[in-house]
Design a protein with these regions (language model features):
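C-terminal interaction segment
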Residues: 1-59, 66-114
Length: 114
């Protein structure tokens, strides 16, 4: 299901994948998701690495994951007091501790063909 995240009247984004640990009833998301995942392509790489990185950081998205299929690389960033910090690069597995007792364990082993 595609879902828009309406940040404000002028800014609406549609990440490749979002994980949301809170309920919502509108046709679009009006609060930051817990995790945003963007899959890079040549046409989106700059925007995903720079513009969306800054936007998601400003909007307090706890985890931002960038998947780069050209280099078989997964980058996981976690929000801290002073911005995003890298916490893992191409892990086999990673556990995300989120709000509302929401914990997600992800097995990244099958993301890329071996």
């Amino acid at each position: 299901m595609q879902l828009d995240w309406k940040i404000n009247e002028k800014t609406v984004v549609q990440p490749d994948l979002m994980i949301i640990c809170n309920d919502f009833v509108t046709a679009f998301l009006e609060f930051p998701p817990s995790i945003v995942i963007e899959i890079l392509s040549p046409s989106t790489s700059y925007k995903d690495r720079h513009e969306k990185y800054e936007l998601y950081q400003e909007q307090q998205v706890k985890y931002y994951i960038i998947i780069d299929p050209d280099f078989n690389k997964i980058e996981i960033y976690e929000l801290a007091e002073n911005g995003y910090h890298p916490v893992a690069v191409t892990p086999n597995k990673f556990e995300f501790l989120l709000e509302n007792k929401c914990t997600i364990s992800v097995d990244f082993d099958g993301v890329f063909d071996k």
